[in-house]
Swiss-Prot record:
Record's keyword terms, sorted: Acetylation, Chromosome, DNA-binding, Isopeptide bond, Nucleosome core, Nucleus, Phosphoprotein, Ubl conjugation
Post-translational modification: Monoubiquitinated by the UBC2-BRE1 complex to form H2BK123ub1. H2BK123ub1 gives a specific tag for epigenetic transcriptional activation and is also prerequisite for H3K4me and H3K79me formation. H2BK123ub1 also modulates the formation of double-strand breaks during meiosis and is a prerequisite for DNA-damage checkpoint activation.
Organism: Meyerozyma guilliermondii (strain ATCC 6260 / CBS 566 / DSM 6381 / JCM 1539 / NBRC 10279 / NRRL Y-324) (Yeast)
Compartment(s) of residence: Nucleus; Chromosome
MF terms (GO), sorted A to Z: DNA binding; protein heterodimerization activity; structural constituent of chromatin
Residues recorded with modification Phosphoserine: S11
InterPro entries: Histone-fold, Histone_H2A/H2B/H3, Histone_H2B
Cross-link (Glycyl lysine isopeptide (Lys-Gly) (interchain with G-Cter in SUMO)): K7, K8, K17, K18
Gene (name only): HTB2
Principal subcellular localisation of the protein: nucleus
Region (Disordered): 1-37
Keyword match NAD: no
Any one Gene Ontology cellular component term annotated for this protein: nucleus
Protein name per UniProt: Histone H2B.2
């Protein structure tokens, strides 16, 4: 027997082949479930229909709007998290969210966002009781 050469780093060797398991009728009939992708599409569509009932929206525009909502959500959440950390609090409250919105959105847009949020929360609270 010849002397063995130095060992090289293991490369991706194929795994040992095992005899194939027999497929049963039940495993063939199972369908793969689609992975769910959560979007704001239905909510964006509802708001669109409230404001402009006769207007539609394309898939591309809906994708852009979804990205926009995700981006704003991340910005507000990140800013609120920083504010909570500055104040040595471990919980993000409505106050941190409101302050984050005021810091992120410019001028009139922030004022309208805060007033709409306050109005909506009041409406929700009164409906829950």
């Amino acid at each position: 027997m010849a002397p063995k050469a130095e060992k090289k780093p293991a490369s991706k060797a194929p795994a040992e082949k095992k005899p194939a398991a027999k497929k049963t009728a039940s495993s063939d009939s199972k369908k793969r479930t689609k992975t769910r992708k959560e979007t704001y599409s239905s909510y964006i569509y509802k708001v669109l229909k409230q404001t402009h009932p006769d207007t539609g929206i394309s898939q591309k525009a809906m994708s852009i709007m979804n990205s926009f909502v995700n981006d704003i959500f991340e910005r507000v959440a990140s800013e609120a998290s920083k504010l909570a950390a500055y104040n040595k609090k471990s919980t993000i409250s409505a106050r941190e969210i409101q302050t984050a919105v005021r810091l992120i959105l410019p001028g009139e847009l922030a004022k309208h966002a805060v007033s709409e949020a306050t109005r909506t929360i009041t409406k929700y609270s009164s409906a829950a009781n």
